[in-house]
Amino acid sequence: MKRILFTAGGCLFYLLLAVKAYAYDCSATPAYQDGVNYQSGDLVSNTGAAYRCNVAGWCSTGGAYAPGTGWAWTEAWDELGSCDGGAGSSGSSSSSSSSSSSSSGSSSSSSGSGSSSGGTSCDGIEAWQVASIYTEGNVVQQNGERYIANWWNQGQSPEDNSGAYEVWSAAGSCSGAGSSSSSSGGTSSSGSSSSGVSSSGGSSGGDSPIARHGKLHVCGNGLCNADNVPVQLRGMSTHGLQWYGWGNCITGNSLDTLAEDWNADILRVSLYVQEGGYETDPAGYTAQVSHIIDEVTARGMYVLVDWHQLDPGDPNANLDNARQFFTDIAQAHGDKTNIIYDVANEPNNVSWDAIQRYAMEVIPVIRQYAPDAVVLVGTHGWASLGISDGGSAQDIFNNPVTIDNIMYTFHFYAASHGQVYRDELRSALERGMPVFVTEWGSQTYTGDDGNDFVSTQAYLDLLDQYQISWTNWNYSDDFRTGAVWNTGTCSADSWGVGNLKEAGAWVRDKIRNR
């Protein structure tokens, strides 16, 4: 069955969370209704519990923020306790659970301590084990308390890692000691779980990309690790989150596959601004990006947050939205060492000087909360260093972004972009430009048609020569040849190599074999 956090996976999560911290008189508390314009301080009842609105805009959004059921509800509401009967309008507020209200919206973790007055039996719930692997929804007990895993983890004690933005959620006290066998438990290091995770895989413990390289910084043409050794990251890009995001092609199982089987270093998270993307639901899409960041981080990979502006091509048209989005994401995740930010996907039909002005406006927003983060700037001509718009890399050399620790992006589709584009890229690299290839394909610029692996290999050889990091487009089952998975793979949540398209098998090999 496909794992969707806010449906199948969410049911388990919130059902088990139904053991509330304290009783609350809901007789005068109105029932929650989707679509109502709730204000901060408003009280509602839902799923047998009382809640108080904490962030007005998100309380009114519904869906992911519906109290007690949405996967990001803890970002909008404080839980006041279990209803001891009834539902109606204005009950008094007792102490709230400590759910975080960061403006970014993020993970599904609950922050309350969840200890009930009498407790619930923990018979059949296994004790947490340091060597076991746990995935979303797994339930354990530790020192008389129950906990639910929010995402993949190993060796992270529930007692020390539960709460908002943590890998575990507290789910109440145990009334009994409990036994050590349960179908909801994790996987021992010698076995395999239902999601196919094994502790011997590349992303666990000290063998993950983050563990190997630590915090990255720009050096020369590319990236260096914490020891100042050049690093080339190889990985994948999502398709648009509005079509193929969390719960569709991006699931716990698909990320396990990317980390454990493909041995990828990085996932680019592509948030479209238009085309049904961010501007239609800023809070919802911010929460989705934030949750994916947590999921990818838990698997030991780097995350490239991609502000996927495309049409209009001038990034300044989305300047206010960009400021808000990057404020929210950087504020929530600025303390992480594995986040790279791309402030403009493919600027087009706009001068480099206009892009440079935009970058000088947006990068300080990120640096306010993530002062050492690597930031990428999209180049003109659909990230072609200007070639596709009649410009060149010289435009960038004439007016560079005068902020440290930044890189410029280059995109190619090998069946469309031949030697002229490679020559311009090589020239820019020879002159010392720091470059990250955040999107490429072996097809035409439409992401479709036949694969030109000869031209593609010529590009990859050049990137290897200069240790240039890259992410391939795209990790979905879209019908086009550039999507790595066959149509239907995502709905089946089955990620074996037999489901790969020709280009998918090819790029998997390039990621695995260095």
Curated annotation (Swiss-Prot):
The active site is at residues 346, 439. Optimum temperature is 50 degrees Celsius with CMC-Na as substrate. Thermostable: retains 59% of its residual activity after exposure to 70 degrees Celsius for 30 minutes and 49% of its activity after exposure to 80 degrees Celsius for 30 minutes. InterPro entries: CBM5/12, CBM_sf_5/12, Glyco_hydro_5, Glyco_hydro_5_CS, Glycoside_hydrolase_SF. Its EC number is 3.2.1.4. Residues 1-23 form the signal peptide. Residues 91-114, 179-201 have a biased composition (Low complexity). Belongs to the glycosyl hydrolase 5 (cellulase A) family. This is Endoglucanase MaCel5A. The lineage of its organism: Bacteria, Pseudomonadati, Pseudomonadota, Gammaproteobacteria, Cellvibrionales.
